[in-house]
């Protein structure tokens, strides 16, 4: 029977699991890159349409721009089940944020409604490719009883970056120009991608060999591992929990 925990304890536990898991630290960096790029779409589309780049002031132009972003997102989402059968979550998500970075720097050269629609379509592709597999990572990185806390941590931590980039996108566009906003947020997204590549190893094995030195007598791990001078050594799908508080260095 899982131990009952307070809301505060569950939230804290989720954040501790999240930050102790390398692939989830990579996911956090991906979330930062996504929010940096997508803030331009969600905050500045109306401003761009109404004069930031001299486009026609029209509800139709706005609808077409947002529809382009939505179409890119939908196409990526529909393609992902097939892609994820052939590629790793890491490859797909980092390709998605890479596409966002390229799109942000391309935005510094954007002129006219057709280029805006094409760019928003590309950003939609990258946004969906980077975001959609995140639930798989959270599921893979937790026991059933810890998943509510871990999903809560994902919600809280990812929204910190939205809290930063929403006002920053608006301020940069209003204070300087859309070109500057694209460039600055593109640099922020690129930095986040670099961090993701550093903290999320391409070698992300499901099962990791590791050693326990302080298991209680009668713990099931005694039956599945081999004795060593320091304790029990064995291999199984690794998630951070009470008996596995730190990620093994061999699993990176």
Indicate where each model-derived feature is located.
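Helix-to-loop junctions at the C-terminal end of transmembrane segments
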Residues: 75-89, 173-174
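A single, central transmembrane helix in multi-pass transporters
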Residues: 16-79, 178-179
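Substrate-agnostic recognition of the 12-TM MFS/MFS-like secondary transporter fold
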Residues: 10, 26, 34-42, 69, ...
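Multi-pass alpha-helical transporter architecture, strongest
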Residues: 186-216
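Structural signature of the two symmetry-related core transmembrane helices
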Residues: 91-106, 183-187
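Helix-loop junctions at membrane interfaces in 12-TM secondary transporters
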Residues: 108-120
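Transmembrane alpha-helix termini and helix-breaking/packing motifs in multi-pass membrane transporters
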Residues: 47, 51-53, 164-183
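Flexible cytoplasmic inter-helical loops of multi-pass small-molecule transporters
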Residues: 1-16, 206, 210
């Amino acid at each position: 029977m899982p131990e009952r925990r307070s809301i505060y304890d569950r939230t804290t536990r989720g954040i501790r699991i999240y930050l102790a898991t390398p692939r989830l630290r990579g996911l956090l960096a991906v979330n930062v890159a996504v929010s940096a790029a997508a803030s331009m779409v969600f905050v500045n589309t109306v401003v761009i349409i109404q004069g930031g780049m001299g486009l026609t002031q029209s509800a139709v132009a706005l609808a077409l721009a947002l529809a382009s972003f939505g179409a890119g997102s939908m196409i990526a989402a529909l393609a992902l089940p097939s892609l994820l059968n052939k590629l790793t979550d890491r490859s797909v998500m980092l390709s998605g944020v890479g596409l966002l970075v390229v799109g942000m720097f391309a935005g510094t050269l954007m002129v006219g409604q057709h280029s805006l629609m094409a760019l928003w379509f590309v950003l939609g592709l990258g946004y969906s490719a980077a975001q959609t597999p995140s639930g798989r990572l959270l599921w893979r990185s937790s026991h059933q009883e810890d998943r509510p806390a871990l999903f809560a941590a994902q919600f809280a931590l990812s929204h910190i970056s939205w809290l930063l980039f929403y006002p920053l996108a608006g301020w940069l566009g209003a204070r300087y120009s859309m070109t500057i906003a694209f460039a600055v947020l593109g640099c922020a997204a690129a930095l986040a991608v670099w961090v993701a590549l550093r903290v999320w190893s391409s070698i992300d094995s499901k099962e990791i060999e590791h050693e326990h030195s302080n298991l209680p007598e009668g713990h099931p791990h005694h039956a599945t591992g081999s004795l060593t001078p320091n304790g029990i050594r064995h291999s199984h799908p690794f998630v951070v929990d009470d008996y596995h508080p730190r990620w093994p260095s061999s699993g990176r």
